[in-house]
């Protein structure tokens, strides 16, 4: 993303948080950025396009930070605690983004915005699901969807207290609090043999496919990026790279993927300078998913 685009996004975000999306004009955003209205439209064809870019920008930024945390050698619990800490740090660093979403009637309910929000929620839920199953195993399996909703709900209330009411809690402390609450919920639900309020299948019908081991939306977006870049290459190795990605995708979808094949195909992709960065990021994401 170009620096000017980042400037427009971050400036618009502050204005949306202060005045609301509907009450902020393109002219005001341009003026605050010290650019002309015409220059604004060079980067974004409409205010709605700006909003979609804004949502995707902060989504990618947040999950990239989470997935770049060093967790090698950590237990699943320690890794999840680190990831929650960074998640909360990122949210608190971007209070304007949260304020914009909390402002009543701030965001337009268009199909594009709804799909973007659905993608973000799906990715967030899948992140929690994989972590819960890695930590608690079969004990949490019947309750994964319900636990995700409870984690998101509790986190939101606590973060609103910190952002709107001035409660001072370190992100690491909040992560500890949430982990303790999860322990209590898993223990209580499993010991009572509760019937889940919502199943994983029901949650999938609302937010898109949610399963243990399914590639998360960020992984899928990197695979798509690799595919697009391979298709745009005009080299003798394009066919071989395309075949490597085909084999990699097929192996990732298996219930028990073979690590040697995964490593081999990613190695083939990293040999291309144009694909190396995406391939390395994909390698890291798959490690995080214990593939």
From Swiss-Prot:
Gene: yuxN
One MF term in the entry's GO annotations: DNA-binding transcription factor activity
Pfam families reported for this sequence: TetR_N
SUPFAM superfamilies with a match to the protein in the record: Homeodomain-like
GO cellular component terms listed in the entry, alphabetical order: protein-DNA complex
Domain HTH tetR-type: 2-62
Keyword match Electron transport: no
InterPro entries: DNA-bd_HTH_TetR-type_CS, Homeodomain-like_sf, HTH-type_Tx_Regulator, HTH_TetR
PANTHER family tied to this protein: ACREF/ENVCD OPERON REPRESSOR-RELATED, TRANSCRIPTIONAL REGULATOR, TETR FAMILY
Taxonomic source organism: Bacillus subtilis (strain 168)
Taxonomic lineage: Bacteria, Bacillati, Bacillota, Bacilli, Bacillales
Keyword terms of this UniProt record: DNA-binding, Repressor, Transcription, Transcription regulation
Record feature DNA-binding region, as residue ranges: 25-44
Plastid listed as a keyword: no
Name listed for the protein in its UniProt record: Uncharacterized HTH-type transcriptional regulator YuxN
